[in-house]
Amino acid sequence: MNLLTIFVLVLIIVLIYAVYQIMTKSTTKVSGFSDASKSLSVPCSKFGANANFGYSTWIYIDSWQNTVIPPANPPAANAAIFFKKNILSRVKDGTTALFNLYLDNAQNDLKLLINGTPTPCTIKNIKLQKWVNITISVYGNTVDMYLDGKLVRTCVLTTVPTALATSDTLYVGGGYQTQTSTWSVLPDGDLRGYISNVVYKSDYFTPEEAWTIYSAGYSGAGMFDFVNRYKLNFSIVKDDQTVGQVSI
């Protein structure tokens, strides 16, 4: 192997590393493939916290189920409200919900609550029995919701979200209940299906990044698989004649 070939190989490695660093900057894979009906807890110490942030995940809704929970008799003034189709919930101190991404109990509408805002940001008619990519991007008090790589909803919060902390816990799947401003996990939920490739970014997602994640597919690792889907072909030319080829 001559010096020119070695130089080209080193240059290729440097370029690929630079592309990888750009594509994965501030981005962490939180969890892989999981049963959506079971609650999976992930300590947020593994992926940090920031004022601007984003989550991306794939969901597959296999079937729709509603568990009827009988009300108390007589009904309590502060009766618990059950959310049986949790996708992602970030919780502070085990009781305060900072971020709730879930499906409506009665219909296939995607809803997002941040910092307990009274009105959720909603996307109606999420497709059933099909893998769907959801990417949430938070910048200040603006929330962008992407579905399959396309921006479909922007919501403006009345206040800037509470800063996230590495001591928070992220719950993937399962369900939860709220009562008098407190939050508690339900180990089993009504979301029959799967959740795959949950990705956290300690900054907002750009439209290009949302599309890249969707393009990578549910079976990959989101942005981490983007580089692996492409190959680079280089030809080594001497006196207008190809003397070697390198494929990465």
What are these language model-derived features?
Residues M1-I248:
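Extracellular glycan-associated modules
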